[in-house]
Swiss-Prot record:
UniProt subunit comment: Part of the 30S ribosomal subunit. Contacts protein S5. The interaction surface between S4 and S5 is involved in control of translational fidelity.
Biased composition (Basic and acidic residues): 1-16
SUPFAM superfamilies assigned to the protein according to its UniProt record, in alphabetical order: Alpha-L RNA-binding motif
Gene giving rise to this polypeptide: rpsD
GO biological process: ribosomal small subunit biogenesis; translation
Species: Bartonella tribocorum (strain CIP 105476 / IBS 506)
Name of the molecule in the record: Small ribosomal subunit protein uS4
Any one GO MF annotation of this record: rRNA binding
Pfam families to which the protein is assigned, alphabetical: Ribosomal_S4, S4
KW rRNA-binding (keyword) present: yes
């Protein structure tokens, strides 16, 4: 198991939930956190603890991005007109690593970040290796020609455990996808309950 796979499953165990809906997640077999003290009974969380957990779960879902980067995204969401929680989800789902993952070009969000970093992705015909690149409606994301036959990609598009959401039009024959719109929170197919409102409360303290 790779280091990133270990990290991914550690996030699942820490949250006590299979946050990506993966069949191999260890929480499918046990419901306690990682480490030797993981089986200790958990006390009731304070309001702060509940808010922190909601933030950590959402941050973890997107590849456990850094706190600095996540907070920066929140600040941008808060500055925009409309509901801050909705804005936050829209910004996170607009990230290139999220779009590549949602389009099923790769099996996990962690693989997506590495895939982009290694230069396997074009956006509107140009090679892009920035994971946090903000996709705009109409942007065309494509696996580069030399990368289309990678086993990782060929196996990923066959995954039955998740579908491509309707705000992304994916052509798996051409290995190309169009980001059609910024989704609302209700449109995003999370495997577990996410609570962006609690994330907003956390940062508003």
């Amino acid at each position: 198991m790779s280091k990133r796979e270990t990290t991914k499953y550690k996030i699942d165990r820490r949250m006590g939930e299979n946050i990506w809906g993966r069949p191999k997640s260890p929480v499918n077999r046990r419901d306690y956190g990682p480490g030797q003290h993981g089986q200790r009974r958990k006390g009731k969380l304070s309001d702060y603890g509940v808010q922190l957990r909601a933030k950590q779960k959402l941050k973890g879902f997107y590849g456990d991005i850094s706190e600095k980067q996540f907070h920066k995204t929140y600040v941008e969401a808060a500055r925009r007109r409309g509901d801050t929680g909705e804005n936050l989800i829209g910004l996170l789902e607009s990230r290139l690593d999220a779009v590549v993952y949602r389009a099923k070009f790769v099996p996990t969000i962690f693989a997506s970040r590495q895939f982009i970093n290694h230069g396997h992705v074009n956006v509107n015909g140009r090679r892009t290796n920035i994971q946090s690149y903000r996709c705009k409606p109409g942007d065309v994301i494509e696996v580069r020609e030399k990368s289309k036959q990678l086993v990782l990609v060929l196996e990923s598009v066959q995954l039955a455990e998740r579908d491509v959401p309707d705000y992304i039009e994916a052509d798996h024959k051409q290995m190309k996808a169009t980001f059609t719109r910024i989704p609302a929170f209700a449109d995003v197919p999370y495997a577990v309950q996410m609570e962006p409102n609690l994330v907003v409360e956390f940062y508003s303290r």
